[in-house]
Amino acid sequence: MERTPEYYLTKGLDMVVNGVAAVIFLCCLAYAGYALWDNWSILDGSENALKTMVEYKPDEEEGLSYNFSQLMAMNPDVCGWIVMDHTGIDYPIVQGEDNFEYLDKDALGNPEISGSIFLDWQNNRKFTDPYMVLMGHHMQAGKMFGDLDKYSDETFFRKNTTGKIYLPDRVLYLETAAFLTVDAYDKYIYRTQWDNVSERQELLKRIYEQAQYTRGEELTTEDQMIALSTCSTSGTNARHVLVCRIVHSSASEEGSGKVYVETENE
């Protein structure tokens, strides 16, 4: 059969299309490989920083002050250590000069895309405010505050209710009270200064308005509260927030968990 110019043109176009498709496929394959490597390197970096610090994780039997002196020697911004039972949340807490400093630094102060768990810069680093906010990235494999997602399941929320925050001079025992999804710019949930009872009533009203689940006795203005916040996949500005009450402090003779009088930042 005689091959016409149209035949060669069609053949050439087919080769071009196949070549372009092959290039696109190889680019996609390379990108997928890079994404996997990038995710691994992020998780590996945060794990390495934690391994360095976990040796000095506070222990009541060994003595809180000794362990914290070691941690603070590595980074003076370390102010606590949080553990939420039956989750992967088991990390040092830092406090920076603002709420941006530790978004991309590990708890040793080194550059790290997974960041750190950090206390709002306006809160007292001694954890004496009536309402405090802890923030952390929502990372894969439950790293950092990724496991806050677990509390979006009502069964998990109701069965897993406890946690601790280790401080240089005492341990705060936490009890979960509410799980909510809010906007990142919520003027109540992310406000840290609540100077009087009437203002704190507004905060409590907001918590219960936004709550997906609540448990235990209803929060009151006498409760000292800590909110754990991370990004939510439900929207760009959506945030998951787990509100906990302090039910007991190992350094408190009464163990009432009520608000301390000291509120001035260091």
Q: What residues fall within each predicted segment?
A:
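Hydrophobic membrane-insertion alpha-helices, especially the h-region
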Residues: 16-36
